[in-house]
């Protein structure tokens, strides 16, 4: 299970005080969300650069070859088996890279730089991933001085195939840049941190974008397609609204639900909404694990589809052998609350709490890993001030990592959770509460000393 722990280096999770990216754009394949530059004037069709940062929330296999960019029927930049594939002008100039982008807990920085005037074929199309050369598997380079449909007068699409309403990505996007007339390198957009070695973004506002270039930073929720390069080459949004703005970014990466471990559940809304509809117990996990510190997140019960549906929320310390059935919840290193049964479950014991949860209730988790106690709240009100102590669990005594967990225990029907770890929530938040560091956006404020599960806080407290 791919999980971000405090010791991991996942590209562009900078915690320093240099250039910070405040916002990203959430796109969802199931909602047909994409954006595009509508009918631009033709730019330089031989020399150009694309740069963007992306955090995937769905992998190839769920959607066949999801598209990153397209412009016309023969110009495509998309995933193929979770590797990058670029089509300069038809199949005769199609290049595919070797490495796979399968870590859904990570932000990736992708740069594609083209200059067909180069005499050396390998220099005509260059790709970079997190600041390093990203080699191509084949050598179908364009001929010298050839022109393509890229940077032409046709519309340039992001997150779909040429606007045909298909092959969308589910992902977070940040720092989308198009450069007209220059072949730039990765170091024009980012740099390696001198202390940590992490690839981090630079402020790109001073770049020469060229006449048809643009820069999307997604900071204005009322105009998410706004070009802030100075060119006013704004993009048009399709099925994207202000609510799709996120604070999960390449400089502060938030926990989400891990797509890697799903079976039949449906994961949408930036990997925050999980739906289980079959007659089987299903488990899902977060992308970040902790062994110390105090942490806060929320989960909204969206629907009970059956009288025998029991949504559960909590943590597990069995990262390699998590519970897959309701019976397994009572064994091992798990601490969960059964939303409908009014039970905390740990160490083969059930403990009663206040009133049962109902549809649309928000359950808050306050996880104290320093003392190994989990507290639960119903719509901001604590269930039991004593919490549930799990310090005797073998994972706790070994100071092992615990990870957020959701389980839908059903004997008929199903249910769903809308999770909010602070970076994005599918439900409307009226209060906009943050932790003491100003991170996260929650319906209910974290208690003092409890923090959102994000890389800024993990670096300091995790």
Regions found by a protein language model. Name each.
Residues 29-48, 94-102, 162-165, 200-206, ...:
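Short surface loop/edge beta-strand patches of beta-sandwich-type extracellular domains
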Residues 1-46, 83-85, 90-92, 152-154, ...:
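Low-complexity, glycine/proline/serine-rich flexible segments
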Residues 93, 148-173, 408-411:
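Extracellular glycan-interaction patches encoded by glycine-rich segments
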């Amino acid at each position: 299970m791919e999980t971000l722990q405090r010791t991991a280096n996942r590209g562009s999770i900078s915690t320093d005080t240099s250039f910070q990216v405040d916002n990203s754009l959430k796109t969802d394949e199931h909602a047909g969300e994409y954006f595009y530059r509508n009918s631009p004037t033709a730019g330089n069709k031989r020399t150009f650069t694309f740069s963007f940062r992306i955090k995937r929330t769905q992998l190839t296999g769920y959607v066949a070859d999801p598209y990153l960019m397209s412009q016309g029927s023969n110009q495509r930049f998309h995933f193929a088996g979770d590797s990058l594939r670029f089509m300069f002008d038809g199949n005769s100039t199609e290049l595919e890279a070797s490495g796979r982008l399968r870590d859904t807990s990570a932000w990736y920085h992708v740069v594609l730089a083209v200059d067909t005037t180069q005499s050396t074929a390998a220099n005509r199309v260059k790709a970079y991933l997190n600041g390093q050369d990203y080699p191509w598997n084949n050598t179908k380079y364009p001929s010298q001085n050839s022109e393509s449909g890229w940077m032409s007068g046709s519309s340039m699409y992001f997150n779909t195939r040429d606007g045909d309403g298909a092959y969308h990505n589910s992902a977070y996007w940040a720092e989308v840049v198009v450069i007209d007339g220059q072949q730039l390198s990765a170091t024009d957009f980012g740099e390696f941190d001198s202390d940590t070695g992490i690839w981090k973004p630079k402020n790109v506002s001073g770049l020469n974008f060229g006449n048809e270039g643009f820069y999307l930073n997604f900071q204005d929720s009322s105009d998410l397609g706004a070009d802030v390069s100075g060119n006013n080459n704004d993009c048009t949004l399709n099925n994207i609204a202000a609510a799709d703005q996120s604070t999960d970014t390449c400089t502060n990466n938030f926990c989400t639900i891990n797509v890697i471990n799903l079976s039949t559940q449906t994961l949408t809304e930036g990997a925050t909404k999980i739906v289980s509809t079959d007659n089987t117990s299903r488990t899902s996990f977060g992308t970040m694990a902790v062994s110390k510190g105090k942490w806060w997140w929320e989960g909204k019960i969206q629907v009970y589809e059956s009288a025998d549906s029991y949504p559960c929320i909590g943590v597990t310390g069995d990262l390699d052998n998590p519970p897959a059935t309701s019976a397994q919840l009572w064994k091992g290193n798990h601490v969960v609350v059964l939303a409908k049964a009014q039970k905390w479950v740990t160490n083969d014991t059930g403990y009663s709490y206040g009133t049962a949860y109902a549809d649309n209730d928000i359950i808050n988790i306050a996880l104290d890993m320093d003392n190994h106690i989990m507290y639960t709240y119903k719509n901001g009100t604590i269930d039991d001030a004593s919490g549930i102590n799990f310090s005797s669990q073998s994972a706790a005594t070994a100071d092992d990592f615990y990870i957020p967990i959701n389980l839908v225990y059903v004997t008929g029907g199903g249910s769903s959770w809308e999770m909010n770890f602070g970076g994005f929530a599918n439900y409307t938040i009226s209060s906009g509460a943050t932790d003491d560091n100003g991170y996260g956006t929650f319906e209910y404020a974290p208690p003092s000393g409890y923090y959102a599960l994000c890389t800024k806080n993990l670096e300091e407290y995790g």
